[in-house]
């Protein structure tokens, strides 16, 4: 039986029994997704849900949803895990971890408050006018936010949606053909908790293809007040071409990440961290380590220890299924590296691949837990491989070394500096791809104080007409 993915408009699962269907093949299994009609577009464009919720009400709703995801018997969670395994090729452990993280994000009330506090300067600014300088300021939602999701990291879609919810924006979510499940499961869980809740009613989920008739997608894009685009170069280019001229575009495009191991005294701890950063999401994420730069003389010991830790991850977080082409690319990379006389070691059943090669001698990168290790003398030999708009995360072991290198790494384009083993946890207060996303999802409105309000520099009321009449402007210049 072919699985059918629902279309959701305004928090309501649509009856698409008479619709045309688009068939996707995922992990050798068929999925049907309804094709959007003109009436669907009109329903999306006319949707206008009044959202007078406070930040407390928003966070409490998300927490309630998160408690459902926390339950291992929640039917929506169980179905989601099965879908990730069957259609996306996730291992049981990977799929369960993804569901666990959804629960963690939704249930972390303090973190949700702090995200707003850190990005917008105050968690109250979306609810009320806040005194700032000589004004009162309030942050209002942009309006309709269109989310063009990627399929490589399901949690990126969850994050995108939650940012829009926290800033009271409506969400029009275009799922990826590689993962039509995550956003749909999340919004269905909103419906399970409260189908009439303003957050539920302000969200729509659907799919369209960039390579087919664009008449319908263009109409949807035309109503966007802000576009959040995730994915590769083609996806970002498509978003840029089709977003309205007035709409802001948040671009989360393709990035690469590296690890620096700085002559650690605890080689095992460093290897554990690097192994995690290689294995999480099987290197499909922008934050996944692909290259390791080892500063010091104990690279052989580190190489062997890293191999052991990769074997451990083979057991505690098995990699997902791969198709024939992916396996062939893995084998080809191994043979090319052996032919180049590099030191090569691989795990059982292609569970991982480790290659020691000179810095700059990059071969193919099949991902799927394959990494290159390069021995260098100091940080100056790493910097040529750190690039603006390309290098996202630099993971460092030991953590203390990050203080030595953070300035030069930042100057050359690194966007995020972390402790090895923490690549998938974006700390509250940090930037994402060089920006604070929530600031781009709101409009700041200023209510400025009157002429009678004195400033720090001018202790009398501002009487501009009098200053002109008496030609006394310069008297008040500090």
From Swiss-Prot:
Q: Which CDD domains match?
A: ALDH_Acyl-CoA-Red_LuxC (cd07080)
Q: What is its EC number?
A: 1.2.1.50
- Pathway membership: Lipid metabolism; fatty acid reduction for biolumincescence
Catalytic activity reads: a long-chain fatty aldehyde + NADP(+) + CoA = a long-chain fatty acyl-CoA + NADPH + H(+)
Keyword Nucleotide-binding among UniProt keywords = no
Q: Which InterPro entries does this UniProt record tie to the protein?
A: Ald_DH/histidinol_DH, Ald_DH_C, Ald_DH_N, CoA_reduct_LuxC
What domain of life?
Bacteria
Q: Which residues form a coiled coil?
A: none
- What Gene Ontology terms describe what this protein does at the molecular function level? acyl-CoA dehydrogenase activity; long-chain-fatty-acyl-CoA reductase activity
Q: Which UniProt keywords apply?
A: Luminescence, NADP, Oxidoreductase
Q: What processes in GO biological process is this protein linked to?
A: bioluminescence
What family name appears in the similarity comment? Belongs to the LuxC family.
Function as written in the Swiss-Prot or TrEMBL entry: LuxC is the fatty acid reductase enzyme responsible for synthesis of the aldehyde substrate for the luminescent reaction catalyzed by luciferase.
The identity of this protein, by name, is: Long-chain acyl-protein thioester reductase 2
UniProt source species: Photobacterium leiognathi
High-level lineage: Bacteria, Pseudomonadati, Pseudomonadota, Gammaproteobacteria, Vibrionales
């Amino acid at each position: 039986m072919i699985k059918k993915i629902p279309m959701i408009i305004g928090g309501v699962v649509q009856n698409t029994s008479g619709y045309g269907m688009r068939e996707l093949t995922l992990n050798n299994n068929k999925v049907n997704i309804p094709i959007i009609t003109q009436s669907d577009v009109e329903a999306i464009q006319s949707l206008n849900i009044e959202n007078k919720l406070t930040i407390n009400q928003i966070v409490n709703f998300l927490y309630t949803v998160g408690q459902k995801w926390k339950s291992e018997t929640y039917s929506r969670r169980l179905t989601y895990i099965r879908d990730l395994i069957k259609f996306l090729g996730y291992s049981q452990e990977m799929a369960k971890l993804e569901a666990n993280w959804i629960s963690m994000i939704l249930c972390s009330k303090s973190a949700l408050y702090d995200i707003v506090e850190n990005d917008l300067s105050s968690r109250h600014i979306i609810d009320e006018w806040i005194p700032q300088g000589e004004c009162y300021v309030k942050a209002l939602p942009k309006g309709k936010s269109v989310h063009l999701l990627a399929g490589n990291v399901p949690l990126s879609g969850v994050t995108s949606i939650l940012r829009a919810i926290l800033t009271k924006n409506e969400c029009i979510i275009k799922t990826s053909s590689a993962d039509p499940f995550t956003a749909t499961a999340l919004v269905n869980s909103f419906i399970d908790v409260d189908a009439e809740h303003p957050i539920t009613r302000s969200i729509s989920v659907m799919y369209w293809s960039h390579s087919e008739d664009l008449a319908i997608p263009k109409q949807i894009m035309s109503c966007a007040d802000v576009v959040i685009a995730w994915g590769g170069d083609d996806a970002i280019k498509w978003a840029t071409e089709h977003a309205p001229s007035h709409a802001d575009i948040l671009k989360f495009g393709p990035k690469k990440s590296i690890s620096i191991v700085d002559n650690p005294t605890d080689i095992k701890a460093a290897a554990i961290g690097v192994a995690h950063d290689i294995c999480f999401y099987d290197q499909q994420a922008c934050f996944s380590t692909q290259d390791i730069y080892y500063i010091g003389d104990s690279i052989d010991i580190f190489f062997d220890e890293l191999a052991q830790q990769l074997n451990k991850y083979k057991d505690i977080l098995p990699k997902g299924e791969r198709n024939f082409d992916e396996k062939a690319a893995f084998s080809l990379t191994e043979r090319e590296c052996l032919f180049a006389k590099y030191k090569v070691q691989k795990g059982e059943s292609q569970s991982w691949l480790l290659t020691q090669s000179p810095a700059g001698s990059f071969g193919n990168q099949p991902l799927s837990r394959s990494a290159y290790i390069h021995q260098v003398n100091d940080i100056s030999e790493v910097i040529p491989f750190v690039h603006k708009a390309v290098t996202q995360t630099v993971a460092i072991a030991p953590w203390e070394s990050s203080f030595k290198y953070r300035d030069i790494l930042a100057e050359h384009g690194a966007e995020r500096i972390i402790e090895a083993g923490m690549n998938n946890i974006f700390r509250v207060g940090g930037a994402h791809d060089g920006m604070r996303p929530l600031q781009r999802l709101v409009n700041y409105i200023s209510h400025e104080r009157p002429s009678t309000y004195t400033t720090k520099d001018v202790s009398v009321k501002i009487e501009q007409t009098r200053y002109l009449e008496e030609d006394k402007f310069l008297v008040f210049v500090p």
